[in-house]
Amino acid sequence: MTLAQRELLVLCALATMGDTSAQLGPHGRACLQVGNSKAEVVAALVHCFPYIGFPRVAAAIRAVKGL
């Protein structure tokens, strides 16, 4: 697994937990630093929607929105 894939996985795992906006920002930045695009970050979070629900996905996207 590449570092970029690992960071996306961590970001999605944090999104599933809820109330992790303080951690989502730094991991969102790390996603970009290791080579993921903003579109990939958002797509990974949107892919979580059926599993974790809209409120958590929306909160995660808000947390990484300003990156």
Model feature map: region roles:
Residues 1-67:
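Hydrophobic alpha-helical segments
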